[in-house]
From Swiss-Prot:
The keyword Coiled coil does not apply. One of its GO terms (biological process) is cell migration. The keyword Cytoplasm applies. Acts as an actin bundling protein. May play a pivotal role in photoreceptor cell-specific events, such as disk morphogenesis. CDD domains: beta-trefoil_FSCN2_rpt1, beta-trefoil_FSCN2_rpt2, beta-trefoil_FSCN2_rpt3, beta-trefoil_FSCN2_rpt4. Localized specifically in the outer and inner segments of the photoreceptor cells in the retina. Keywords: Actin-binding, Cell projection, Cytoplasm, Cytoskeleton, Retinitis pigmentosa. InterPro entries: Actin-crosslinking, Fascin, Fascin-like_dom, Fascin_metazoans. This is Fascin-2. It comes from Homo sapiens. Transmembrane segments: none annotated. It is linked to Retinitis pigmentosa 30: A retinal dystrophy belonging to the group of pigmentary retinopathies. Retinitis pigmentosa is characterized by retinal pigment deposits visible on fundus examination and primary loss of rod photoreceptor cells followed by secondary loss of cone photoreceptors. Patients typically have night vision blindness and loss of midperipheral visual field. As their condition progresses, they lose their far peripheral visual field and eventually central vision as well.
Length: 492
């Protein structure tokens, strides 16, 4: 497969939570650090970088400031260094319960404290020097085995997860990381959890919880017995092996999970590449040849469609659409026009893609009618995590409303309904819009919401009122935005 941004390893960003459940924060004023924040936002986000030398020391860089954490000999800490010096070198010492201890490499003292009383002067580790790692990236991704160069996916027939996919195609390749009790669970697309013996279980039991470790920018998952997940045997079954130290077999990359979609034309048949290079609406079944990976260009907001056969849709002579391009170009870009529950696609020749009488697609129309409208269905988010500008969407304690500014997230279930989606929460209740634009999550009857894919990795959600869902100043989810922009766009 060509690169073209299809396989992008996620830069691991995280927060560090102390023993009093407060996040390590880098302040712009005076470049001071504290542990006062109750949730994970921009100021609480950090990146681990390897030290330029050959040792085991690491650097902690604030994503917010772009500066490095440092500890002086007298224990004073700051986040002021634009270039990493000797005082910026730390050793990460993972503890049996999964938490980290940070020790200054040049001075040998431990970093910790509470509120604005942080220092790196402790000679022994107490609870104040223990830090929990909380990933700051969107938790839905693909998992790539570093040693086998194969993607992890659910194998329903064998009832296991295996690292044997040469590409992350279809819903089975989606994994959701669930953060609970200072550890992480791996949740499959059918909402089961991976246990360390390779079994899939419905509850996040202790043997299905893992400690995250970082090594050279890669991830390792350590189980409660101190062993690491790895692909095992010819099938690459994912389970805890015998190793108590992470080697290449135990390392994984997290990759961005782009939306994969199917399109249905006016003849009620699926758009497909099953019968060759022509893109045609001529299939009754929804399989790999009918599934397309959709990417949106951040600058132009136009999209590309990549097929399972290894080619992008591209405009050819006489307006034809073939799935043969190996590189992104102007001819592979399509402008999306959202028309209620349907979408129209405009090609680089300025004409709309339509379905011809023989089912083939061609960009030959000047206007949009039924033959130019398609139903677009997202297939690789049966479970959904939403993040806005202020945080994740999560149920509001003691209420039927939804918060939009949380550092923890709820996992919602999606079902498709003729160009729209129904969203179901943790207790089985459906989302619906109430009075004055409020969005509630305890409905007995489902309301249809339209998803509009507006930017790379972000969508807008339109309620039946025609208004878009946004994160309000109160921190509650509301359906009162007029335009799909800003706080009305959601990372998914």
């Amino acid at each position: 497969m060509p690169t073209n941004g299809l396989h992008q390893v996620l830069k691991i960003q995280f927060g560090l939570v102390n023993d009093t459940d407060r996040y390590l924060t880098a302040e712009s004023f005076g470049f001071k650090v504290n542990a006062s924040a109750p949730s994970l936002k921009r100021k609480q986000t950090w990146v681990l970088e390897p030290d330029p030398g050959q040792g085991t020391a690491v650097l902690l860089r604030s994503s917010h400031l772009g500066r490095y954490l440092s500890a002086e000999e007298d224990g004073r800490v700051a986040c002021e260094a634009e270039q990493p010096g000797r005082d910026c070198r730390f050793l990460v010492l993972p503890q049996p319960d999964g938490r980290w201890v940070l020790r200054s490499e040049p001075h040998g003292r431990f970093f910790g404290g509470t509120e604005d009383q942080l220092s790196c002067f402790a000679t022994a580790v107490s609870p104040a020097e223990l830090w929990t790692v909380h990933l700051a990236i969107h938790p839905q991704a693909h998992l790539l085995s570093v040693s086998r160069r194969r993607y992890v996916h659910l194998c329903p027939r064998e009832d296991e997860m295996a690292a044997d996919g040469d590409k992350p195609w279809g819903v089975d390749a989606l994994l959701t990381l669930i953060f609970r009790s200072r550890r992480y669970c791996l949740k499959s697309c059918d909402s089961r959890y991976l246990r360390s013996d390779g079994r899939l279980v419905w509850e996040p039991e202790p043997r299905a919880c893992y400690t995250l470790e970082f090594k050279a920018g890669k991830l390792a998952f350590k189980d409660c017995d101190g062993h690491y997940l790895a692909p095992v045997g010819p099938a690459g079954t994912l389970k805890a092996g015998r190793n108590t130290r992470p080697g290449k077999d135990e390392l994984f990359d997290l990759e961005e999970s782009h939306p994969q979609v199917v399109l249905v034309a006016a003849n009620h048949r699926y758009v497909s590449v099953r019968q060759g290079v022509n893109v045609s609406a001529n299939q009754d079944d929804e399989l790999d040849h009918e599934t397309f990976l959709m990417q949106i260009d951040q600058e132009t907001k136009k999209c590309t469609f990549y097929s399972s056969t290894g080619g992008y849709w591209t405009l050819v002579t006489h307006g034809g659409i073939h799935a043969t391009a190996t590189q992104v170009s102007a001819n592979t870009m399509f402008e999306m026009e959202w028309r209620g529950r349907r979408v129209a696609l405009k090609a680089s020749n300025g004409r709309y893609v339509c379905m011809k009488k023989n089912g083939q697609l061609a960009a030959i129309s000047d206007f949009v009618g039924k033959d130019e409208e398609f139903t677009l269905k997202l297939i690789n988010r049966p479970i959904l995590v939403l993040r806005g500008l202020d945080g994740f969407v999560c149920h509001h304690r003691g209420s039927n409303q939804l918060d939009t500014n949380r550092s923890v997230y709820d996992v919602f279930h999606l079902s498709f309904s003729d160009g729209a989606y129904r969203i179901r929460g943790r207790d089985g209740g459906f989302w619906y819009t109430g009075s004055h634009g409020s969005v509630c999550s305890d409905g007995e009857r489902a309301e249809d919401f339209v998803f509009e894919f507006r930017e790379r990795g972000r969508l807008a959600i339109r309620a039946r009122s025609g208004k878009y869902l946004r994160g309000g100043a109160s921190g509650l989810l509301r359906a009162d935005a007029d335009a799909p922009a800003g706080t009305a766009l959601w990372e998914y």
